[in-house]
């Protein structure tokens, strides 16, 4: 059975997200720990979390994926921006301990003229500051499309960040299908080769989640424009290949396509229909 979900609004709490997930045929989901623009996180509601955890157990939910706010820039040259990112990451990881054993995903950020090497150094330094040996959450670096001065466009850049981090066992990678295709990794025609390269550079054991997104822009465009599954430049067959690939099929899949909950339900149904049991 595949673990497939989508990004859901956390405005009404965890139990509500779980019930929405069930209503659209999902058995996992992604959520923001706070407003995606980075405002203060909501207070923990232990009863809400307890109700959700019971619902998740009773319905066979897979691993959840929390997503950091988009505004975070851990490798900013502005000390105040970097401090804000560190504060949010620390607070979010404390929150995630109430949902033990799940995943937390973030964008490495933009070096904004400092150079990729400096960006890598700053991201790693920040991870060394916020990760703890006791935490039960795996932090995922997301593969990026390479727009502007983004860090994390190549597998080598992600590996360089990890190499500098002390608690490597607390790290993993979330592969975004739109991003890697836009970054020049041909997962449409050469999926096996891309995964072999990932394994050689990072190790497939680091791959912990997949963002399933088609792309509005062509291959190697270095753009980040998500599209509905099968409606973009990747096409339907690419996603059939991805969800059934022996290396990927047991991972949790998360849709971030430009659809509402009902639309995501349609995509989830289609993906399940094409998943080979």
Swiss-Prot record:
Catalytic reaction annotation: Endonucleolytic cleavage to 5'-phosphooligonucleotide end-products
Named cofactor requirement(s): Zn(2+)
Q: Where does Zn(2+) 2 bind?
A: 142, 176, 211, 256
What's a single GO BP term from this record? Answer: base-excision repair
> In terms of domain of life, where is this protein from?
Bacteria
Enzyme class, UniProt record, top EC level: hydrolase
Membrane-spanning parts: none
The residues listed in the UniProt record as binding Zn(2+) 3, with positions renumbered to this chain, are: 179, 224, 226
Q: GO MF terms on file?
A: deoxyribonuclease IV (phage-T4-induced) activity; DNA binding; DNA-(apurinic or apyrimidinic site) endonuclease activity; phosphoric diester hydrolase activity; zinc ion binding
Keyword Nuclease belongs to the record: yes
Q: For binding Zn(2+) 1, which residues are annotated in this chain's numbering?
A: 67, 107, 142
Q: What is its EC number?
A: 3.1.21.2
Q: How is the cofactor bound?
A: Binds 3 Zn(2+) ions.
Keyword vocabulary terms for this entry? DNA damage, DNA repair, Endonuclease, Hydrolase, Metal-binding, Nuclease, Zinc
The protein's job, in short, is: Endonuclease IV plays a role in DNA repair. It cleaves phosphodiester bonds at apurinic or apyrimidinic (AP) sites, generating a 3'-hydroxyl group and a 5'-terminal sugar phosphate.
User: What PANTHER family does the entry give?
Assistant: APURINIC-APYRIMIDINIC ENDONUCLEASE, ENDONUCLEASE IV ENDODEOXYRIBONUCLEASE IV
What does the sequence similarity comment in the record state about its family?
Belongs to the AP endonuclease 2 family.
Q: What is this protein called?
A: Probable endonuclease 4
Organism of origin is Akkermansia muciniphila (strain ATCC BAA-835 / DSM 22959 / JCM 33894 / BCRC 81048 / CCUG 64013 / CIP 107961 / Muc)
- List the taxonomic lineage: Bacteria, Pseudomonadati, Verrucomicrobiota, Verrucomicrobiia, Verrucomicrobiales
Q: Which gene specifies this protein's sequence?
A: nfo
């Amino acid at each position: 059975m595949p673990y497939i979900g989508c990004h859901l609004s956390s405005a009404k709490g965890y139990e509500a997200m779980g019930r929405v997930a069930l209503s659209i045929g999902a058995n996992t989901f992604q959520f923001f720990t706070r407003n995606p623009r980075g405002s203060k996180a909501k207070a923990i509601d232990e009863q809400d979390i307890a109700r959700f955890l019971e619902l998740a157990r009773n319905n066979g939910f897979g691993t959840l994926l929390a997503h950091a706010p988009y505004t975070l820039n851990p490798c900013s040259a502005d000390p105040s921006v970097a401090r804000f990112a560190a504060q949010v990451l620390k607070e979010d990881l404390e929150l995630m301990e109430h949902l033990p054993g799940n995943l937390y995903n973030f964008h490495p950020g933009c070096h904004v003229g400092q150079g990729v090497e400096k960006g890598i150094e700053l991201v790693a330094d920040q991870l060394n500051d916020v990760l703890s040996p006791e935490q039960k959450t795996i932090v995922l670096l997301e593969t990026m499309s390479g727009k502007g001065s983004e860090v994390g466009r190549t597998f080598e850049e992600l590996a360089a960040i990890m190499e500098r981090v002390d608690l490597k066992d607390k790290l993993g990678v979330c592969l975004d299908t739109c991003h890697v295709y836009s970054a020049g990794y041909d997962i449409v025609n050469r999926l096996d080769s891309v995964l072999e390269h990932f394994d050689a550079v990072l190790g497939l054991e680091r791959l912990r989640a997949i963002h399933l997104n088609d792309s509005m822009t062509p291959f190697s465009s270095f753009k980040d424009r998500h599209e509905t599954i099968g409606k973009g430049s990747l096409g339907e067959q690419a996603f059939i290949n991805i969800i059934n690939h022996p290396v990927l099929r047991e991972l949790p899949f998360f849709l971030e396509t430009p659809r509402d909950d009902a639309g995501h339900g349609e995509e989830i149904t289609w993906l399940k229909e094409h998943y080979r049991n």
